[in-house]
Amino acid sequence: MDISRRSLINATAAGAAAGALAATPEPARAAPLTSTLGRDATQYDVRPNSPDDQTKVLQRAIDAAASAQMPLALPPGAYRTGALRLPNGGQLVGVRGATVLKFTGGASLIASEGASGITLTGLALDGAGIKLADRRGLVHFQNGLDVRVQDCDIVGSGGYGIWFESIAGEVSGNTIRKTANTAFTSFDALGLLVAQNTIQDASDNGIEILRHTMGDDGTIVVNNRIDDIKAGPGGSGQHGNAINAFRAGNVIVSGNHIRNCDYSAVRGNSASNIQITGNSVSNVREVALYSEFAFEGAVIANNTVDVCAVGVSVANFNEGGRMVTVHGNVIRNILPKRPIGTAPDDDAGIGIVVEADAAVTSNVIENAPSFGIMAGWGKYLRDVTITGNVLRNSFVGIGVSVVPGAGTALVSNNLISGSRGGAIVGLDHAKAVTNDLGADGTSRFAQIVLGLNAVR
């Protein structure tokens, strides 16, 4: 019994000593940058905060790290550099908010041609306002797969912020500010996600999803914050938009916060099957949400729009534009005028405009100085339903084209309140040519089918 007790005491003491030894603190060791981010660029004579131009040593370091299939890690500091090229597999990594590449001139700060598996992460890229050639980005990537630009701060580009052409990949978590042209442009995407970026003070468009010819694109543009977009080059709507899809089919634009644009929040031009959903839009000075020209298929749903010249426009049946659902949007505080030169007839002050093969349902529209909802433009009206909407304080609640050749519209189960110019009227283009058709619930025009509507 004594031996067992002695053994137990000795074992306990030894364990306590070992525990105390293990608990003794060791001197703290800073994890080297190379072990956390990649191969340390200072191994290649790259020097942070050097007054010298480091283009040559940076390029040598980028090439060596890519050959070794390692990211190149740039320690905190500023690096003066001209044009750099990312080879296949090139990855350039910095410390977010602390690693700055300052552009000294060249075609682009960082470019690639035909390189896949390339990444920029955690870098501040300062374009210094140096003018770039036309159609050139401070970051300029062409013909690549698995291309990623993430968590970077891009400022002061004298051209485009980021230019992609024939790229598959991701642009996410970046801040792009003060660009002379568009903040982010993609041509002929091969599968692209544009997400959670902050874009401010662009002098053309915020995000452009473009194709050289009409076709499937499939880019997803989600959860971005886009503010202060100017129409620097002028024009009648091709500039000054937060998000612009041109000839790009099957694009999804969802969950974006958009504020203060000279023209539209989202503009789809010949962009079939575009989905514009769940966006928050405020203070845009032309059409807030636009689907126009030669498109087939659009969903515009569950957006909020506060201050615009037109809330939603689905136009150009004469060009083949057709087939849309406009559902569940809240649109208010509509301006009586568009910017000068954008619309020959200045058809502003409207909540929703549609023309062909359209369902307009469950929207709430308030304070439209012209029309709450407008269906058709001259003879360009076909198969439109307007049901279950709430229209408050519009001059005219619902206007429907009644010119010869115009097609059918069903108007039913809407609540129309405070429309001094009439609840439901017939139109010749933007001009009212009938009395209030909703006064007695019947229509003398065969193509207008009136159901039960509440008017007060």
Sequence positions of predicted segments:
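N-terminal secretory signal peptides and thylakoid transit peptides that target proteins
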Residues: 1-16
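C-terminal segment of N-terminal export signals and the immediately downstream linker at the start
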Residues: 22-44
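Acidic Gly/Asp/Thr-rich repetitive segments characteristic of extracellular carbohydrate-active
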Residues: 41-75
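Extracellular beta-strand-rich solenoid/capping regions of secreted or surface-exposed proteins
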Residues: 59-67, 79-93, 100-122, 126-147, ...
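Parallel beta-helix/beta-solenoid
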Residues: 87-88, 96, 114-115, 120, ...
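Extracellular beta-strand/beta-solenoid scaffold signature
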Residues: 103-111, 131-141, 156-163, 178-189, ...
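Detector for outer-membrane/organellar transmembrane beta-barrel domains
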Residues: 228, 330-333
